[in-house]
């Protein structure tokens, strides 16, 4: 619960992951189009790449395989196609790593392994924190994906803008699809080799457009 809290001081509230640019371009303009956008990102970006990668990172940390964890951390960083997306995961990963250090999560050796990540990405540090706490993989993965969903909905409420009830309706709809998304992520992570798919050209294009957008509330 702690790791999925919107009060976690890692700056998630300041990012929209391209949603603000989609609003500016008219791709997102009301509750229905917002729901369609977030659902699309959930199944084409999160379920196919970031969530299964989180599983691989979690298993590496739990097995004490620092080399594998560092390798998947670098893979994720390289897969971020725009400067804003790279800066986002770097900043949030760095902030979560600092929190883990200051609160003394896990062992000194594990904290040192996290500190050695160059750069630390959010899924790598989040997966390590869950492994430090000996959380079940399903619980940690669910917390990671749901916190992403909440952040997307919160960004839409501010950016479209939408009302609070619209946000809750969207969360209810999106939450109903989470079991299938998590199952897909686990299956992709368990394949040999892992079936990671980062093909999301529209996501990359709107993120790139956001870098030069005239008026912005969010950092991505």
UniProtKB/Swiss-Prot annotation:
Claim: Chaperone is one of the keywords in the record: yes
Keyword Cytoplasm: yes
Entries under Gene3D superfamilies matching the protein: Urease accessory protein UreF (1.10.4190.10)
GO molecular function term, any single one: nickel cation binding
Keywords: Chaperone, Cytoplasm, Nickel insertion
GO CC terms in record: cytoplasm
Matching InterPro entries: UreF, UreF_sf
Subcellular location: Cytoplasm
Subunit structure: UreD, UreF and UreG form a complex that acts as a GTP-hydrolysis-dependent molecular chaperone, activating the urease apoprotein by helping to assemble the nickel containing metallocenter of UreC. The UreE protein probably delivers the nickel.
Role of this protein: Required for maturation of urease via the functional incorporation of the urease nickel metallocenter.
Family of the protein in this entry: Belongs to the UreF family.
The protein's name: Urease accessory protein UreF
């Amino acid at each position: 619960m702690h790791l999925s809290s919107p009060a976690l001081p890692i700056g998630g509230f300041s990012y929209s992951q391209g949603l603000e640019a989609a609003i500016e371009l008219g791709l997102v303009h009301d509750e229905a189009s917002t729901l369609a956008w977030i659902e699309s990102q959930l199944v084409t970006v999160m379920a196919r790449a970031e969530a299964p990668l989180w599983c691989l990172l979690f298993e590496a940390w739990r097995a004490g395989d620092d080399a594998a964890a560092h390798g998947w951390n670098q893979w994720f960083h390289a897969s971020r196609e725009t400067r804003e997306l790279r800066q986002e995961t770097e900043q949030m990963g760095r902030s979560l790593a600092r929190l883990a250090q200051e609160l003394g999560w896990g062992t000194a050796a594990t904290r040192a392994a996290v500190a050695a990540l160059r750069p630390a990405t959010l899924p790598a540090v989040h997966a390590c924190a869950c492994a430090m706490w000996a959380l079940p993989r399903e619980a940690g993965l669910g917390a990671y994906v749901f916190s992403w969903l909440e952040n997307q909905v919160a960004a839409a409420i501010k950016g479209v803008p939408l009302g609070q009830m619209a946000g809750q309706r969207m969360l209810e709809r999106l939450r109903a699809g989470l079991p299938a998304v998590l199952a897909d992520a686990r299956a992709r992570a368990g394949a040999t080799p892992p079936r990671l798919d980062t093909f999301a050209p529209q996501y990359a294009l709107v993120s790139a457009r956001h870098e030069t957008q005239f008026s912005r509330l969010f950092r991505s």
